[in-house]
């Protein structure tokens, strides 16, 4: 991977700001998208036991945390050229048995959600920046499995 640019980091940050503009709504978009593609993912998230509920603070907190991690991943890539995930993230994902196909479902849901959040500001360049940031975050989480 080439260097993550300042512009790419700014694009990721702008999508984060758009997401923060309506976290409950975009959390619903995100988790609904995940469950449409992988209904069994419901078992990985305790707060989805009763479906996607925008008033559930755990649902919105988890979405906000994940989207924030992608933003942080972009910042790490720009500053250091690599992403280091907290060992606890690796541990919980390992315990839950999260696999590559599930990381892909989350990535697709993240992109779909942020595309809706940014509206007509969506570009291929933004998509690429988000994909790089997410992919490097996912790789760092998987590396922390050990």
From Swiss-Prot:
The modification Nitrated tyrosine is found at residues 26, 31, 134. The modification Phosphoserine is found at residue 46. Residues 3-146 form the Globin domain. The keyword Ubl conjugation does not apply. Nitrated mainly at Tyr-31 and, to a lower extent, at Tyr-26 and Tyr-134, in effective nodules and particularly in hypoxic conditions; this mechanism may play a protective role in the symbiosis by buffering toxic peroxynitrite NO(2)(-). Nitration level decrease during nodule senescence. Phosphorylation at Ser-46 disrupts the molecular environment of its porphyrin ring oxygen binding pocket, thus leading to a reduced oxygen consumption and to the delivery of oxygen O(2) to symbiosomes. GO terms for molecular function: heme binding; metal ion binding; oxygen binding; oxygen carrier activity. The keyword Cytoplasm applies. It is found in: Cytoplasm, Cytosol; Nucleus. Its main location: cytoplasm. O2 binds at residue 62. GO terms for cellular component: cytosol; nucleus. Heme b binds at residues 46, 93, 96. Keywords: Cytoplasm, Heme, Iron, Metal-binding, Nitration, Nitrogen fixation, Nodulation, Nucleus, Oxygen transport, Phosphoprotein, Transport. GO terms for biological process: nodulation. Root nodules. It comes from the Eukaryota. InterPro entries: Globin (IPR000971), Globin-like_sf (IPR009050), Globin/Proto (IPR012292), Leghaemoglobin-like (IPR001032), Leghaemoglobin_Fe_BS (IPR019824). Belongs to the plant globin family. Leghemoglobin that reversibly binds oxygen O(2) through a pentacoordinated heme iron. In root nodules, facilitates the diffusion of oxygen to the bacteroids while preventing the bacterial nitrogenase from being inactivated by buffering dioxygen, nitric oxide and carbon monoxide, and promoting the formation of reactive oxygen species (ROS, e.g. H(2)O(2)). This role is essential for symbiotic nitrogen fixation (SNF). Monomer. This is Leghemoglobin alpha. It comes from Phaseolus vulgaris. The lineage of its organism: Eukaryota, Viridiplantae, Streptophyta, Embryophyta, Tracheophyta. The gene is LBA.
């Amino acid at each position: 991977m080439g260097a993550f640019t300042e512009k790419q980091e700014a694009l990721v940050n702008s999508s984060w700001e758009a997401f923060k503009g309506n976290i409950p709504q975009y959390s619903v978009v995100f988790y609904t998208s995940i469950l449409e593609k992988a209904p069994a993912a419901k078992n990985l998230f305790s707060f989805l036991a009763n479906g996607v509920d925008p008033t559930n603070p755990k649902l919105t907190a988890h979405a906000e945390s994940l989207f924030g991690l992608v933003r942080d991943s972009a910042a790490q890539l720009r500053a250091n050229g690599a992403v280091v995930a907290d060992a606890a993230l690796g541990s919980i994902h390992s315990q839950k048995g999260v696999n590559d196909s599930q990381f892909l479902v989350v990535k697709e849901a993240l992109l779909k959600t942020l595309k809706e959040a940014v509206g007509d500001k969506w570009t291929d360049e933004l998509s690429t920046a988000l994909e790089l940031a997410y992919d490097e975050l996912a790789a760092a989480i998987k590396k922390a499995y050990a």
